[in-house]
Amino acid sequence: MLERQSLAVPVVSTLMLLWVLYRTIAYFRFHHKYKFPNLVPGVPLFGNMLQIPKDTAERRIYLHNLAKKYGEMFTLKVGSNYWIFMNSQRVANELLDKRGARYISREKLPMPGDVASRGKRLVFMPYGNLWKWQRKVIHEVIGPGNRNVFAPQQDIESRALLYQYLTEPDLWNQANARYASSLVMSLVFGRRTKMGDPNIDRIIETNNEIMKMFEPGSSLIDSFPFLAYIPLPRAIQPWRWWGDGVYKESLKNFSEEFEGLAQRQRQGKDVTCFVSEFQRLGRDKTIDYETMVFLGGTLIEAGSDTTRVALNQLVAGAALFPESVERARKDLDLVCGANAERLPNSSDIAKLPYIKAVGKEVLRWNISFPEIAHSLIEDDSFEGHHLPAGTNVIWNSWGVHMDASEYEQPDRFWPERFMNEDLDKPIKGHLAFGAGRRVCPGWVIASNSLHLLIARLLYCFDFHTVPGHPIPVGKPFEIGTEKPYEVKLTPRSQAHAALVKAECAAAAEIE
């Protein structure tokens, strides 16, 4: 027995030395072959993981400061992963657009992508057949060719928001959240929602949990993905307790919406929405139930946050920079009449270029969305840097959108900056919808909805700052559902108040 133990010590020691030698050789070979841009100094094993702030706003500022120090690109090492941050539109356009076929996949995130989604959330899917099929179906149903199919939902939800602004102006933030959730819910599942809708609240809650999983270091298996493949008992995998719970709750919430739609269809109600069109085309016969449920559900998650945050930014920009509102009204009054003759309609937007510019500025100014990395599917070289397949490349959105070298007076809400842009391409000039072949597939409908709402809100309402409650500029706003700042809303005139009451009251009645 003693002899065996005495032999085990040198054997184990030799194996450990061989492993260290192997890892050392692999490390030097890797860094001899590949060259990352401006690798930010970190600590052994963890890299920069412990340096990155957990708070979202603080993290945006931290990344912005690194961009000022290192320039257009820098690299953070988070555990065993390398993240390259793009800090200029030039670099982002070159890599994500011009070389989009190489940067088409998603970073490997075991926690949100595998454990909490089982590979079924489109936003986390790697490049492959399922991702291509789902993108094709979404484009087929809600792409540019069908932009008018869902116009009735956009019209009625914008009218409901106007009426809520008129009757409950202090609840503008909740009204924005209701509008965003109800619009996307009606587009996807054919159901309108009220403030405090219980299933919407549950979906938002699980989506917030997904967003927390993006925080660097929030889950050990995202920083050290190899841990996901070690067959450990579930009892000592705390990430699975969290992720499994989010998946089960998401499946339950999404299934409830599918079952509700099926019941309405059995009752003979004519419901035109993404899922009903999906079924009409027979696409539901080609995938399993859970994948179908998550396809619809993740459209809800993706659409509601973006719309709500954009509306909050519009309110803040209009209150802080009333000159932009006055400029917009010059065009609106020419089209709709200065004395509240009628509401702007979707058909008017083509004659309102400044409204389109406001839409772009809303999606640029001080806005903060989660960064979801693109992942290289093959090695690439760029300006002396050599990047391996699997490298994560992230657009530093808030930092670039608020960078004076990219945008003149970035703290200023100034739609005029986009008047010389191609206003018929809403995704140009900012990256709020993403970029390249991973651009949001619903950007056409989202842009149309935003333009209509901007036109109607600026035509009918005044926005005022509240003394003693300054609106912060130059600091990222959180994506949470709480009221981000104080703003006073009033009708533009008694005539405009009467117009909203007459034209919008019926839309605010939700069953």
PLM ranges: what are they?
Residues G143, S219-D222, W242-A310, E341, ...:
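Conserved cytochrome P450 catalytic core segment spanning the I/J/K helices
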